[in-house]
């Protein structure tokens, strides 16, 4: 889920975010050149396939996602590359308990896009809440049944 909660952070916070995202750029980008938004990448709730990420897996993914490119339709063609994750953090909601009995925890990715004429409509759709879902693709080395 895309959440545009980072568009107008304070000056100090913006400097930190710009420093983080500029680690992935060929030149230093300014606040005016980028669009910042947050995405809910994955969580520890049981999904439609009866699977969930453990808290340990979410912690590992937190570092693995940084620097990854956001693409459309799980298709890595160049023209489908849209955004890049420059930071990630785990967020807990102590008021929400998962079906597995844990405090609901999700991995929030902080993403940026370079503002261009070509993505102006996409930015408006993200701001307007139209484009808000994201999907991640991954493969697990093993699965552990929580019942057996």
State where each predicted segment sits.
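Signature of dsDNA virion morphogenesis modules
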Residues: 1-148
């Amino acid at each position: 889920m895309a959440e545009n909660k980072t568009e107008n952070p304070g000056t100090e916070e913006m400097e930190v975010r710009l420093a983080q995202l500029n680690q992935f750029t060929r030149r230093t980008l300014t606040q005016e050149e980028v669009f910042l938004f947050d995405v809910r990448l994955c969580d520890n709730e049981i999904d439609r396939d009866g699977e969930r990420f453990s808290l340990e897996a979410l912690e590992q993914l937190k570092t693995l996602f940084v620097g990854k490119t956001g693409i459309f339709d799980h298709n890595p063609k160049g023209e489908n590359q849209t955004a890049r994750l420059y930071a990630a953090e785990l967020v807990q909601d102590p008021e929400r308990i998962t079906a597995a009995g844990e405090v609901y925890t999700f991995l929030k990715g902080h993403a940026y896009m370079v503002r261009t004429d070509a993505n102006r409509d996409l930015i408006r759709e993200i701001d307007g809440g139209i484009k808000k879902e994201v999907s991640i693709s991954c493969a697990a080395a093993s699965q552990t049944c929580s019942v057996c």
